[in-house]
Amino acid sequence: MDQTTTLSAYDRRRAAERLANFIVESIDGSRAVEKPFFHLEFDRVFPDDIYAQMLTLMPESTDYRPMHGRSKGHDLKDGTHTRVKIDLFPEYIRNLPSEKHALWDVVGRALCSEPVKQAFIRRLAPGLSKRFGDQFAKVGMYPIPILTRDIPGYLITPHTDTHWKGITVQLYLPKDDANTDIGTIFHEKLPDGSMPKKSQMRFAPNTGYAFAVGNDTWHSADPVHNRVKTRDSILLTYFVDHGVLKVLRNRGKRLGNFVLNEFRYRI
């Protein structure tokens, strides 16, 4: 797989299938943790050679666009966006240089694959059944993988994630373990409304976590400190894709974001 960046389009599809199979094995081998809510913790999500290429072939800062939603409220006073993103869909990354495009095309295709989705659904069954009932496996899930970059000043207060989301996955992409203290924090909400910190993910190379979104999946991130240049990760979100409204919404958002992205490249 170390030749990913020079493969033809056909061979990239085959490489994506192989990468998806590796990710499925990582999901199947992940640790299941019950508290403060059911979640998975990953080690070695990607093969070592692919992970090394991902670090080497990160997009330039100008390739990213602002992340909206909760992140927008934490822009710096001068207007600098503390979280930016690139959607890892073919139509978004096609403007990247050929070597970078080839790699991130493989990564994006693998993350959006059916085997990876089914692996998450299988391993997150306790959380999904709690929300959707015994027929949780029949609930449609629409994957959206985005490469995110946070800079010092970024933070997000405790929240559960919107009900539009079914599964939240974050895969960390640091070069080393020098700043393991900036990982996502998990909380437990007590009867008095307080939300003490119960655990924190380590921001370590090639690690991550996943959970089925529910009304108890409280999580946050402390401000990224100045010892960090960037906090890079992949957010893989599975949006609930069940019913006409949600199906149209998910595809409409993808189309709308594509139009905005194309406009940005043309001005």
Where are the language model's segments positioned?
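Non-heme Fe(II)/2-oxoglutarate
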Residues: 29-123
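Amphipathic alpha-helical surface "interface" segments used
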Residues: 73-80, 140, 144-148, 255-261
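A general structural signal for short secondary-structure boundary/capping elements
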Residues: 85-92, 192-194, 215-219, 254-259
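Short N-terminal signal/transit or membrane-insertion segments
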Residues: 1-26, 89-110, 145, 161-167, ...
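Short, mixed-charge, low-aromatic patches
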Residues: 6-13, 73-79, 124-128, 160, ...
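Fe(II)/2-oxoglutarate
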Residues: 1-35, 250-267
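Catalytic core of non-heme Fe(II) oxygenases with the double-stranded beta-helix
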Residues: 100-236, 240-248
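Residues that form generic nucleotide/phosphate-binding pockets
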Residues: 22, 26, 53, 57, ...
